Structure formats: C-alpha cells, structure tokens
C-alpha cells in the first residue's frame, strides 16, 4: 500500500459525503482509541439545586435527528432524506434508509431538527430528536 501525502488525503476527504466522513471518524476513534471531541473545562462549584439542573436541561441548543424506521413509504422517505441531508446521492440516501436506525443530522438547531422530523413523519417514517 502506497503512502498518501497530506494533500492527497485532503483531496480524498473532499470527495466524501458527510455521512462517509462521520463513519470514518468513528472508525478512526475506535482504532486508535482517541476522541475527536474538543476538551471541555468543568468549573468545580457547589452542587446545583434541583431547579438549576432542570433549567440546564431545557437550555439545549443542538439536537441530533435519528431515523428510527422508514415505515411503509420508503421511496418518499428516501426523497426527504436526500432533501434534508445535503450532498447525499440517491444510493447513499437509500443505504441510509435501509440501515436504520441512523443519525441523519448532528448538532442542528431546534427549528431545523423539528422541521426535518415533521417532513420525515409526514412520509410515515419514525424519527427521534435528541
């Protein structure tokens, strides 16, 4: 196997879809036992009161949209998946729908997550937003 230069690797990554890149990152993290997440600083303070913990949970600003089931109208779901996930070809969308449950959108705004969920549920799909 020939060694690829950094520029060649970047060119390969540019050709990949977001889903393919996401799968690559997951495999990379598993293989080398690392994480691509940015380190988070945690300030040590007193334990929050019960009311404060509830408020923190309500302040979530990024959501993941997960396709749980395609339902009976798989073709309609594939069309909506292609619309929602940018840069996705027909084959990739079909593979994604066939391999449920799958993450469709990661860390999107609440409006985008709710809009995607509504469009998918209108076609008969089962969707969860986390």
From Swiss-Prot:
GO MF annotations, alphabetized: mRNA binding; structural constituent of ribosome
Alphabetical list of Gene3D superfamilies matching this protein: 3.30.1390.10, Single helix bin
Pfam families named among the record's database cross-references: Ribosomal_L12, Ribosomal_L12_N
Top-level division of the source organism's lineage: Bacteria
Keywords for this protein: Ribonucleoprotein, Ribosomal protein
Cited function: Forms part of the ribosomal stalk which helps the ribosome interact with GTP-bound translation factors. Is thus essential for accurate translation.
Quaternary structure, from the entry: Homodimer. Part of the ribosomal stalk of the 50S ribosomal subunit. Forms a multimeric L10(L12)X complex, where L10 forms an elongated spine to which 2 to 4 L12 dimers bind in a sequential fashion. Binds GTP-bound translation factors.
HAMAP family to which the protein is assigned, alphabetical: Ribosomal_bL12
Recorded family membership: Belongs to the bacterial ribosomal protein bL12 family.
Protein name: Large ribosomal subunit protein bL12
Organism: Mycobacterium leprae (strain TN)
